[in-house]
Structures are given as structure tokens and as C-alpha cells.
Amino acid sequence: MEQMNRHDGMPTAAKRKRIPYGLMNFMTLRERNCYYVDKTRFIESIEEANMCFFFIRPRRFGKSLTISMLQNYYDINKKEQFDKLFDGLYIGENPTPERNSYLVLPLNFATVDAGLDNYRAGLDNCVNIGILNFCDRYKQYLPDDIIVRMKEECQGCVDQLKFLAAECEKVNQHIYLFIDEYDHFTNKILAEPKHMVRYREQTHGEGYLRMFFDAVKDATSSSLTRVFVTGVSPVTMDDLTSGFNIGTNYSLSYEFNELVGFTEEEVRTLLTDYAAVCPFNHTVEELICNMKPWFDNYCFSVEEYGKTTMYNSVMVLNFLDRYIRSGYQIPKSMIETNIRIDYDKIRMLIRHDKNFDHDASIIQELVTKGYVMGNLVENFPAERINDPDNFLSLLFYFGLVTIDGSYRGYSRFIIPNEVVRDQIYTYLLDTYKENDLTFEEFDKDKLASKMAYEGDFKPYFTYIADSLKKFSSQRDRQKGEAYVHGFTLAMTSQCKFYRPISELDNEGGYADIFLSPLCDIYEDMTDSYIVELKYCKSNTSDAQVQKLFKEAAAQVSRYADSDLVKESVKTTRLHQLVVIYRGVDMVVCEELKYECPDVCGAAGGA
């Protein structure tokens, strides 16, 4: 049995490596004996790729750590530390000819002030600091007076980059430029439509950002030998690439599908390694079963569909860290606040989605049907974000949908996992709260608890019905069934006791909503639910509603007999419910019995 120590009141194994949650510095990771999932095998492929490498992935997916790893590998100053940094890793045994041969210039545009009114000053400051640090780090390779002359001759970052490239060429040194979060300021633009004109000024013609990337392009003809650029959106790339037209976007390449994030094999190895030195209360397989629905299922290449899906690495490390620090208990919440996608970005997406002229809400369709069909666009300009395929592609790049196959020439996209589903539903609900209307969270939680532990479901679904009617607009009512279904799903997704599964595909057919109980987290909960949700127009008669109830009752009985449902409910008591809306009024909310209920409520407008 492993020797155990106590640290901050929590048991930790003496031999276990540190969990690198939130760590973006590769050298620090290696020096502090942190666990590292080896991605160095991709260095060979990156070297064989175009000299200017563009790579787009969702935020908090491990991009910055990968960039840091590459910087340490290519840095000429780290030559003597190569064995220390890369011993035991793939590239340590298989080094490439270009290792430790570059002067590395790292720039992180996340530090640039996103305000367009002073964007030039922010970009100048970011690049100036980067170049000054560069000159200090590599002073033994550069002319002695390079900083003095640069200050005398250069007015901004465009001039500085040109000057630096020319000086390095004189002394026969090669630069590897890394730009992390190149599109950081674009998020502000997309969230605020009023800034679109200024955005175009920066990225087109004589715009300053455009001029900077033109300078990067020019420098590649001298000492700037390699460029590696990352971000989360292809929008700015499209607006810049007509000037910077030597870069290649490898974001959708099957060769780099696994460059960031974890494969299931990597997650399994990670858990196995920690289980060997920590007193886990669960098997590796049990932990995988808990993690997979929440963190897995990203696919970034059409060619890789059905072969390899990716886990969000930050989510996995956060889960493992909380699991160990809680005494090896499954965390009560599978979602950590730092993982949530930027609030303004989601609101922007929903706003654009609601403003489609054709009134075909992609997000509404995604929530209601569970999938959408479309074409994945590699890059597109900001002014064309409302084109359906462009908008869908933006959802993909942000990590809100993922590839799930193809059909009749179109790609099929789904929500990848429960963490993303929670975010979409949460912010979708926020769009119904824009008129100073708020949910009574405390009351809602109490109702959810009674449903999970006492089988008292009617107050909870009545609460949803009241909220639905309260927040519905005339446009929402026109959407009818899609609105009712989407709103109900969004509300049930906020219930901490269940994982709502929409349109459950099994041998019995399709169930509208299965509230799968999170028994691994709430071991004492007693009740689970499968809900057949029906909708009819506001002028539907009571007799027609009762006929609809009989149809729903037959359907929900078949769903309840499926193996998937039986396995998921575990020791809970499964309630088979029928909920019927007439317009925006809930007129039936009954547990399945053998006689039709009385139809309640009056017909509402819809």
C-alpha cells in the first residue's frame, strides 16, 4: 500500500505527479514533476507542414501549453536543457534536425486591449514588450545596439517587426514567431455589432492589424522562418489572409485532430497512472463512464469521424483534481466555472441566431431535434456571419457543436457533451430574461429536490410551464412545438439531479425527454422520469387532447421498457409522465395510468 501524506487536510499519495490543471508553461510543468500527456509526436508533422501554421480550437483546450512545448523545443537558448525537458517523451528519443535552432518570438494577443478606439496602442504595446524581451533573451546573438537603434528608427510594432527581421538576417539568425489568441479582439467585435465598421478598418486595406500581418508576410522572405498562429475563430483569419496569404489552416486536418485535447486512450492511461498511486474509490472504467458524457465527443476532422473523439483536456484535469481533493468522491458538479465559454460570446451567437431573416433558428433546431445539417466552412468574413453555414461553422469552431457524420452531401452536427449542452441551455434561458424577469432559483431548487427525493413532479413542471408562458414572445409562440420543447429542455438541464436526454434513440423509438438520474453523485436519490412531451395548437379541443394523451401514453410505455432506460435508472423509481401543452398552456401533467386525465387549464394564445 502506498505511503500517504496529509496536505491541507486531504490525503495525497507520496508518489503521484502534480495535476497540471490551468498550467500553460511547459518548462514549469516539467520542473515541478507534473503529469504530461505526450503531444511531442506531432512536432515531426508540424515541421513537415507549411512554414506558416494556423490552428483553431475552442478556448481552454490546451493550445497554450502546446505552444509553450513547441517554444521550449525550438528555443536555441534551451539547447543545454533539452534532455531535462524532453527526457521520456517521444521527441526526446526522436529529435528533429530543427530542434533548438531558432530565436523564439512569443506574442499573446490576449494582452491586447480589445477596445477598437485604442487598439493600435494596445497592439504596439503587446508587440513592443515581446520584442524587447526577445532582444534581451538573445542579446548574445544580436547586434549590441539593436534596442537603441530600434527605439530611434521605429514608430510602432509594424516598423519594429520589420527592423527585427532585418537585423536577425544580418547575423544569420532565424526567428520562429508564435502568436497565441490572434483573434482575441474579434470576440469584442462580434459581441458588439456597433464595432463592425471599426473592425473592418483594422483588418482591411490600411488597417493596422492588417499592416502587422503584411509585415509578418514580408519578414518570411528574410529571417522569419516559421510562424505558428492559434485562436478560436476563423473569422479574423479570413479578413486577414488576402494579405497574409502564405499561411495554411490545419484546423480541420485529420493529421492534427489529436494535437490538443485528450483521446480516450490518453484519459484511460492518465486515470490508470493515478489509480496506481492513489486510493481511488472507483475503477478506471467507472470514472470513464462518469466523465465521457460530460467531456468527450469532440471531432475536428470529417475524416476522423467514427475513429477518434477528443476529450476537453482542461475539463478532464479539473475533474481529476477535484476528485482527488474531495477524498476520491465524484464531484457534485461536473462543470467548473472557469471552463464556461465567454458569456458575451454565447449571447452574440444567440442574438445572431434569433435575427436570421429566414426565421430558421439553428440553435432552436439543435436543441429541439438534437442535430442540424449543414456544410463546414473553413473560414469566412465577419460580415457574413449570418449565412447559415457560416454561423453553424462558427458554432463548430467555438466547440458548441461537433461532427457526427454526413448525410446526402451535408455534415451532421450535434452538441458534443453535457457541459456544452448546459452552457447552451443556460444562455438560451438568459434570452428570456431580458425584460428584468428572473427565475426564483431557490424555489426552483427546492422543487427539483422534491421531485428527485419524493416523487413530487407536478410542482416542478408547473413551475416550468409558468416560466414558459411568462417569458414567451409572440415570435416564440409562433414557433409552437419547437419553442415548448426547447424551453423545457433548457429548464430541465438546470436541474442538478438529472442529465436530460432529448429524443432518446433506442429500440422503442424516440422519447422527448429522459431525466437520467445522476446516482453516482446523489447516491440517495429515489426518483427518475421519462417524459413524453406533446404540443397542440391553442384551439385544440379537449377530446383531441385526450386522444393525444392516449398516443403519448403508449409511446412512453415503450420507451420505459428499453434496456438503456432500465440500466440508467439504477435503483430509482421510474415515473412515466405525459405532459401536453395547448399553445403555451400546460393542460396535462400526469403520471401514466390507465385512464385519461381531465384536461386542465384554458386554451392560451399561441
Regions found by a protein language model. Give the residues of each.
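Walker A/P-loop-proximal flanking segment of P-loop NTPase domains
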Residues: Q3-K78, D83-G92
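Amphipathic alpha-helical segments of the small helical/lid subdomains adjacent to P-loop NTPase cores
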Residues: T236-G243, Y250-D321
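P-loop NTPase motor core
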Residues: G22, D38, D75-D136
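Extended alpha-helical interface modules used as scaffolds for assembling large macromolecular complexes
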Residues: G247, G306, Y311-A554, R558-A560, ...
